[in-house]
């Protein structure tokens, strides 16, 4: 009699949850155990510094509705800490000594905020933003007129500052760099973000460190190394994160700036894999290890690791991607640039509608579109091509991006036409990442299904799930999951076509949930109301 296989995932994160989901989608019928130290089930992190922090999204940004795990026979064990791994016995120790056997082990333990060891660090009112509870605590204090000091001028610091200003707080950013985001974007693009924040009333103190927090029981002031004293009702610290590698290291798994894994996300110990923020993975395109701390990487790397667990995986070579919204400025960034020779701008920089490209040895290593949409796939194609480009042509908005990696002349023009992305759906101004996250935290319609009129359709909330409900002209109710089966965006009702459409990638479904056109391949799940 065959023994049931057990796959254990340590880390109830986005990467861990998507890995568990993928295992079932790929046909794994063994036991799946998903362990999470937090009390919450897996959730999305991007909203924690954006619309959820601002109070614009009340719903918690969970990855899956609560019934998902039981329905898919995934043992989700929250408030459960893994304390040890014994590779020789293939067991994970959890809780007070329980040993859980595994056939494959995936570590998605994520990262934790770096703490500031300065005087006053223990005062109340000093917050680090990483978990859902952190965002809740900060949000409660973002009242009009509150004096908020943000320590750190990276992505988290910049987004928290923007969210606080939109809640009418008085905001000061303190950063070691001369401009925000300088380490990632460089001084030229960082200066643009500095000006964006200043235009919205944020005070930026760059080139200075933190000396101490001051106050009685609560923080009252922040003192910088340059001698400035800043009054504060609330402090948010965002000075980077450190990968959680202690569990792996204690088991002899190689780690350096994360758990070291190959392009198949396999660690130095057979049967143990890693994905998400904690994985320092060899990247075939870049020819080196990279560790990526962004949402899209967790979304895509978790499923890739699941396929490797099933021995059906391929090399993970996705180009890193992230997005950010600050005030009325939205951006998408693709690539991985730790060094570059020049930054080339294309478009209206003063009007904040442009694309920036980071070039090294004439090749594009990263690109960022700011308030310009439908171009990120083209940017990624240029990065992946590894072809040297002409900087003057790159800066010229009249030169199609598709042509930039092609030789001049008729042959290049013909190849450009052949390789141009399809028009239509992608030309409608669609920003996948923003739509994906916004949809996941959106509050569904509160209309009871019994009140739907003939010919009416709505996405409604039913027991924590988002359901696409449509009552046809005969009064028959059709209820299906509102989550697109391609990549998890929410569908919307197309009144003209009487279909459920996904505006992330263009999938379309009949009211019954049957796929009309892809990229989705699976029908929407039927729901009984």
Segments predicted by a language model, with ranges:
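A Rossmann-like FAD-binding core segment of flavoenzymes
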Residues: 29, 76-94, 100, 166-262, ...
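FAD-binding core/adjacent interface of flavoenzyme oxidoreductases
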Residues: 2-8, 62-149, 223-225, 236-238, ...
């Amino acid at each position: 009699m065959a023994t049931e296989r057990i796959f254990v995932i340590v880390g109830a994160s986005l990467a861990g949850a998507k890995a568990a989901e993928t295992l079932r989608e790929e046909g794994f019928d063994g036991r799946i155990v998903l362990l999470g130290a937090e009390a919450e089930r897996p959730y999305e992190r991007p909203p924690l510094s954006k619309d959820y922090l601002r109070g614009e999204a009340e719903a918690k940004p969970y990855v899956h509705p609560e019934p998902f795990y039981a329905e898919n026979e995934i043992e989700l064990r929250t408030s459960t800490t893994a304390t040890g791994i014994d590779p020789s016995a293939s067991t994970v120790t959890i809780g007070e000594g329980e040993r859980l056997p595994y056939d494959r082990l995936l570590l998605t333990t994520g990262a934790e905020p770096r703490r500031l060891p300065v005087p006053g660090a223990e005062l109340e009112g000093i917050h680090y933003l990483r978990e859902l509870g952190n965002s809740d605590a900060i949000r409660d204090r973002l009242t009009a007129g509150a004096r908020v000091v943000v320590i750190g001028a990276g992505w988290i610091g910049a987004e928290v500052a923007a969210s606080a200003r939109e809640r009418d707080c008085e905001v000061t950013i303190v950063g070691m760099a001369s401009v925000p985001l300088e380490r990632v974007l460089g001084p030229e693009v960082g200066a643009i973000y500095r000006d964006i924040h200043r235009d919205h009333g944020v005070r930026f103190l760059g080139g200075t460190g933190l000396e101490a927090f001051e106050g009685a029981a609560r923080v009252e002031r922040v003192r910088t190394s340059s001698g400035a004293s800043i009054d504060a009702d609330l402090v948010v610290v965002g000075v980077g994160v450190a990968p959680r590698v202690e569990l792996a290291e204690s088991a002899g798994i190689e780690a350096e700036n994360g758990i070291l894994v190959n392009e198949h996300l396999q660690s130095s110990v057979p049967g143990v894999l890693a994905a998400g923020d904690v994985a320092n993975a060899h990247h075939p395109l870049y020819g080196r290890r990279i560790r990526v701390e962004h949402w899209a990487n967790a979304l895509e790397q978790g499923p890739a690791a699941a396929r490797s667990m099933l021995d059906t995986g391929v090399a993970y070579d996705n180009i890193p991607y992230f997005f950010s919204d600050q005030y009325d400025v939205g951006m998408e960034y693709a690539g991985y640039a730790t060094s570059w020779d020049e930054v080339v701008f294309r478009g209206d920089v003063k009007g904040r509608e442009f694309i920036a490209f980071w070039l090294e040895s004439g090749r594009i290593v990263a690109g960022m579109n700011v308030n310009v949409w439908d171009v990120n796939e083209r940017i990624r194609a240029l990065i992946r091509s590894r072809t040297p480009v002409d900087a003057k042509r790159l800066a010229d908005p009249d030169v199609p991006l598709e042509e930039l990696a092609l030789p001049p002349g008729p042959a290049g023009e013909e190849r450009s036409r052949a390789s141009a992305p399809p028009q239509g759906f992608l030309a409608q101004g669609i920003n996948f990442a923003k739509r994906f996250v916004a949809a996941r935290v959106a509050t569904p319609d509160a209309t009871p299904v019994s009140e739907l009129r003939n010919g009416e359709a709505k996405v409604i909330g039913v027991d924590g799930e988002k359901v696409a409900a449509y009552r046809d002209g005969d009064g028959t109710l059709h209820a299906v999951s509102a989550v697109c089966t391609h990549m998890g965006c929410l569908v919307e009702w197309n009144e003209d076509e009487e279909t459920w459409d996904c505006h992330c990638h263009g999938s379309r479904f009949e009211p019954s949930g049957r796929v009309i056109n892809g990229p989705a391949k699976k029908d929407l799940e039927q729901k009984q109301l």
